[in-house]
UniProtKB/Swiss-Prot annotation:
It comes from Brucella anthropi (strain ATCC 49188 / DSM 6882 / CCUG 24695 / JCM 21032 / LMG 3331 / NBRC 15819 / NCTC 12168 / Alc 37) (Ochrobactrum anthropi). Belongs to the IlvD/Edd family. The lineage of its organism: Bacteria, Pseudomonadati, Pseudomonadota, Alphaproteobacteria, Hyphomicrobiales. This is Dihydroxy-acid dehydratase. Pathway: Amino-acid biosynthesis; L-isoleucine biosynthesis; L-isoleucine from 2-oxobutanoate: step 3/4; Amino-acid biosynthesis; L-valine biosynthesis; L-valine from pyruvate: step 3/4. It is an enzyme of class 4 (lyase). Signal peptide: none annotated.
Length: 611
C-alpha cells in the first residue's frame, strides 16, 4: 500500500521541526496519523463567481475534520475574464491557467498533502485546478461555486432574461437609450456565481461531472440556492473516504487518472458537443489530457463532433434558457441520461461518488428515477433577489422539466440539431484545425464565402466594426492573437458582440487565431492552427482574399493558389512573422515567458520546454 504522502513531514525524529510548525497551525498529537487534505480555494473579491467562496473553504474544512482528516486551506488567483475583456488585461487570462496549475502543484507537493478538494468556479480556475489534479494524481473532489441567477428586466409588460452579453451588445447598439442600457447593466448579473449562460465557466463545471470528478449538480445548482451547500458538505466527507481507500486499501480506482480516463474524456467532450458548450473547453480538455498523459487530440474531438447531436441549447445560443433552466430539466445527469439512451457515452466508468456512471444515472437522471429527493433537488429555482451570499434562498419550481420532446433537454430523436454543437474545421487556412461553436450559428450561414477584412489585433478590429468598416458578407479576420502572437490568446467577445449590435451577427463571419468567450455566438471561428506567429497560413491572408467556410463538410479554405501562397510565405519569412502594423501593446516579462513556451491551440496552448 502507498504510504500517506504527509508522513514525509509528520513522522520520524528528524521531522521534529516540521511537526513543530504543523503544531503552530493548530495540529495536535492525534492529528499526525490522519490524512492531510488540501482545501484549494479561489476566493477573491474581484470575481462574482468567487466572491462568495470566502467561508466555503472552512465549511469544507470542518466536514473534512469531522470525517477524520486534517484540513489545510490555501487560495489560488482568479481572473475575471469579463472584467479583463476588451483591453490588455485579457492577455493574462489564459496564462493564468498555467499559474493556477503550478501554484496548486507547488503548495500540495511542498507540504506533502494527501488529497484535495478543489473549490473553483470561473473560466481558467476550474481548468487550472483540473490540470493540477491530473498532474499530481492524488484523490480529489471538485466542487464549484455554482452559476449565477439569470438577470431579469421587465419591458412592455414582459420579463426578459439577461446575462453579461446582453449588457455588452446593448452598449454598442444605438437603438437602445442610455436608460435602457443602464437598466440592462444593473440587471444582467444580479447575484454571485459564474455568468448564467453556457459560457466557459459553467461549461467546465459541467464537464467535471462528466469526467466523474465532481458530485451530481455541480455544474447546474445555483450559487444562491441552499441545495448547493450539500455539495460542499459531501465533498468534505467524500475526499477523506477516497484518501483512505487509496492509502489504506491500495485502491487506485479512486485516483483522478483512473477516473478521468480516455473514455471519460470522450464522455466529457460528447457532453460539451451535446450542450453547445464554450469552444474554450476544447483548449482546456486538450491541456488536461496532456497532464493525465492521455492521447486525446483534435482528431478525437472531430470524430465525436460528427456523431453527437445538440440536445440542449442554452444562452448565448438560446437567450431564453440559462443554467437555472438546465438544472430544472435534470442538469448534467439529465443530458448524460439522454446521451446514454442514444448509446453515445460509456457508462461503465467510475466516478468519485458512484461505482459506475450507469449506477449514478439510475439514481440521478430525473427521467428514470422516482426518488423524491432527486426531483426536489432539481426543482431548485432562482430567488430573484440580488445577493453576493451563497445558499441564501430556498425557492423551488413547482415541478421539474422532464419533457424530452420540447423541453430544455431533448432526446436524440427530438434533438435541436443532429449535427453537434461544436465542430473542427480543416483546410489550407487551418492545417491543424480550428473550432466553431455550431450551436450558435444560424442555419443560413453554415456555408459562407466572403472577402477577408484583415486586422492585426483585436483592438483595431473593434474600431473597424464600430466605425462601420464591416459590411454584410465580409469576413473579419483577426490575427497575431494566438498563444504566442498575442501573447495569451485573447477572447474576442467584444468583436462578436459588436457585430451583433450592428445587425451583422447573421451576415458576417469572424476568423481568428485567438479564441472566443463562451458568451460569443454567430459564425465565429477560432483557435486557427498554426497561428500567425508560428508561420500559419492565416498570416499570409491579404485584404480581399476570398475565404470559403463549409461547416457541414468541416472545411475552411483560403481561395488562393499554392504558388501564390508560396511566394507570400517567402516574403513573410524575410520580414518575420509579426503584425504588419505596430501595436500599442506592452508585453511584460511574465507574458514573454509564457509566449516563449506556449504551444498552439491544437495542443491546448500548454507550455512546452525547449528540447
Amino acid at each position: 500500500m502507498p504510504p500517506y504522502r504527509s508522513r514525509t513531514t509528520t513522522h520520524g525524529r528528524n521531522m521534529a521541526g516540521a511537526r513543530g510548525l504543523w503544531r503552530a497551525t493548530g495540529m495536535k498529537d492525534e492529528d499526525f496519523g490522519k490524512p492531510i487534505i488540501a482545501v484549494v480555494n479561489s476566493f477573491t473579491q474581484f470575481v462574482p463567481g468567487h466572491v462568495h467562496l470566502k467561508d466555503l473553504g472552512q465549511l469544507v474544512a470542518r466536514e473534512i475534520e469531522s470525517a477524520g482528516g486534517v484540513a489545510k486551506e490555501f487560495n489560488t488567483i482568479a481572473v475575471d475574464d469579463g472584467i479583463a475583456m476588451g483591453h490588455d488585461g485579457m492577455l493574462y487570462s489564459l496564462p493564468s491557467r498555467e499559474l493556477i496549475a503550478d501554484s496548486v502543484e507547488y503548495m500540495v507537493n511542498a507540504h506533502c498533502a494527501d488529497a484535495m478538494v478543489c473549490i473553483s468556479n470561473c473560466d481558467k480556475i476550474t481548468p487550472g485546478m483540473l490540470m493540477a489534479a491530473l498532474r499530481l494524481n492524488i484523490p480529489v473532489v471538485f466542487v464549484s461555486g455554482g452559476p449565477m441567477e439569470a438577470g431579469k428586466v421587465v419591458w412592455d409588460d414582459q420579463v426578459k432574461k439577461l446575462d453579461l452579453v446582453d449588457a455588452m451588445v446593448a452598449a454598442a447598439d444605438d437603438s437602445y437609450t442610455d436608460d435602457q442600457v443602464k437598466a440592462i447593466e444593473r440587471s444582467a448579473c444580479p447575484t454571485c456565481g459564474s455568468c448564467s449562460g453556457m459560457f466557459t465557466a459553467n461549461s467546465m463545471n459541467c464537464l467535471t461531472e462528466a469526467l466523474g470528478l465532481s458530485l451530481p449538480g455541480n455544474g447546474s445548482t445555483l450559487a444562491t440556492h441552499a441545495d448547493r451547500k450539500r455539495l460542499f458538505v459531501e465533498a468534505g466527507h467524500l475526499v477523506v473516504d477516497l484518501a483512505r481507500r487509496y492509502y489504506e486499501q491500495d485502491d487506485e480506482s479512486v485516483l483522478p487518472r483512473s477516473i478521468a480516463s480516455f473514455p471519460a474524456f470522450e464522455n466529457a467532450m460528447t457532453l460539451d458537443i451535446a450542450m453547445g458548450g464554450s469552444t474554450n473547453t476544447v483548449l482546456h480538455l486538450l491541456a488536461a489530457a496532456q497532464e493525465a498523459e492521455i492521447d486525446f487530440t483534435m482528431a478525437d474531438i472531430d470524430r465525436l463532433s460528427r456523431r453527437v447531436p445538440v440536445l440542449c441549447k442554452v444562452a448565448p445560443a438560446n437567450n431564453t434558457v440559462h443554467m437555472e433552466d438546465v438544472h430544472r430539466a435534470g442538469g448534467i445527469m439529465g443530458i448524460l441520461g439522454q446521451l446514454d439512451k442514444a448509446g453515445l457515452i460509456n457508462t461503465d466508468l467510475p466516478t468519485v461518488h458512484s461505482e459506475t456512471v450507469a449506477k449514478a444515472l439510475d439514481h440521478w437522471d430525473v427521467t428514470r428515477t422516482n426518488s423524491d429527493m432527486v426531483h426536489k433537488f432539481y426543482s431548485a429555482a432562482p430567488g430573484g433577489v440580488p445577493t453576493q451570499v451563497a445558499f441564501s434562498q430556498e425557492r423551488r419550481f413547482d415541478s421539474v422539466d422532464t419533457d424530452r420532446e420540447k423541453g430544455v433537454i431533448r432526446s436524440k430523436e427530438h434533438a435541436f440539431s443532429q449535427d453537434g454543437g461544436l465542430a473542427v474545421l480543416y483546410g489550407n487556412l487551418a492545417e491543424d484545425g480550428c473550432i466553431v461553436k455550431t450551436a450558435g450559428v444560424d442555419d443560413s450561414i453554415l456555408k459562407f464565402s466572403g472577402p477577408a477584412r484583415i486586422f492585426e489585433s483585436q483592438d483595431t478590429a473593434v474600431l473597424g466594426i464600430l466605425n462601420g468598416k464591416i459590411k454584410a458578407g465580409d469576413i473579419v479576420l483577426i490575427r497575431y492573437e494566438g498563444p504566442r502572437g498575442g501573447p495569451g490568446m485573447q477572447e474576442m467577445l467584444y468583436p462578436t458582440s459588436y457585430l451583433k449590435s450592428k445587425g451583422l451577427g447573421k451576415a458576417c463571419a469572424l476568423i481568428t487565431d485567438g479564441r472566443f468567450s463562451g458568451g460569443s455566438s454567430g459564425l465565429s471561428i477560432g483557435h486557427v492552427s498554426p497561428e500567425a506567429a508560428e508561420g500559419g497560413t492565416i498570416g499570409l491572408v491579404r485584404e480581399g482574399d476570398i475565404i470559403d467556410i463549409d461547416i457541414p463538410n468541416r472545411k475552411i479554405h483560403l481561395a488562393v493558389d499554392d504558388a501564390t501562397l508560396a511566394e507570400r510565405r517567402a516574403e513573410q519569412e524575410e520580414t518575420g512573422w509579426k503584425p504588419a502594423e505596430t501595436r500599442k501593446r506592452k508585453i511584460s516579462t511574465a507574458l514573454k515567458a509564457y509566449a516563449s513556451m506556449a504551444t498552439s491551440a491544437a495542443k491546448g496552448a500548454v507550455r512546452k520546454l525547449p528540447d
